[in-house]
Swiss-Prot record:
Source organism (scientific name): Desulfatibacillum aliphaticivorans
Gene: rpsG
Purpose of the protein: One of the primary rRNA binding proteins, it binds directly to 16S rRNA where it nucleates assembly of the head domain of the 30S subunit. Is located at the subunit interface close to the decoding center, probably blocks exit of the E-site tRNA.
Organism superkingdom: Bacteria
SUPFAM superfamilies the record matches: Ribosomal protein S7 (SSF47973)
Annotated family: Belongs to the universal ribosomal protein uS7 family.
GO molecular function: rRNA binding; structural constituent of ribosome; tRNA binding
InterPro entries given in the database record: Ribosomal_uS7 (IPR000235), Ribosomal_uS7_bac/org-type (IPR005717), Ribosomal_uS7_CS (IPR020606), Ribosomal_uS7_dom (IPR023798), Ribosomal_uS7_dom_sf (IPR036823)
Protein name as it appears in the record: Small ribosomal subunit protein uS7
The keyword rRNA-binding is assigned to this record: yes
Length: 156
């Protein structure tokens, strides 16, 4: 890791349809093998499915779903003396968003619907309604942090 100066973060250009940086970042999370147009197609199809099912603005559903999944606290391993402890740590804002997006993609890929856009729409709607596998992952993360509260004084 460089010690001289902090490396500047690259700017993410907002996407073309919704003019949102969050959507553009999520397209990058969906993308595999550099196929960005395929990833955009999947996300926009998922948004159309969500709009069809709920009659609400898909961007609002998406943003609320991401906010519902964002973890506040997580555990990190730290070696103290000869044993490893799981230490609860607060999650930084940009990591919260990144984790939420990663969890949505992981659990939407393991869903049973046929098309990826349907899987993604289903997971986003579940997250919007505070249910589903990605919400369970967030709750498990919080539960782990709560269980290891006794080791919070080992924080660095």
């Amino acid at each position: 890791m460089p010690r001289r100066r902090e490396v500047p973060k690259r700017e993410v250009l907002p996407d073309s349809r919704y003019n949102s940086e969050l959507v553009a970042k999520f397209v990058n999370v969906i993308m595999r093998d550099g196929k960005k147009s395929v990833a955009e197609g999947i996300l926009y199809d998922a948004f159309d499915i969500m709009e069809e099912r709920t009659k609400e603005a898909p961007l609002e559903i998406f943003e609320k779903a991401i906010n519902n999944i964002k973890p506040v606290i997580e555990v990190k391993s730290r070696r103290v003396g000869g044993s490893t402890y799981q230490i609860p740590m607060e999650v930084r804002a940009n990591r919260r968003t990144a984790l939420a997006m990663k969890w949505i993609m992981t659990y939407s890929r393991s869903r049973s619907e046929k098309k990826m856009s349907a899987k993604l729409a289903g997971e986003l709607l579940d997250a919007y309604n505070n249910r589903g596998a990605s919400i369970k992952k967030k709750e498990d993360t919080h539960r782990m942090a709560e269980a290891n509260k006794a080791f919070a004084h080992y924080r660095w």
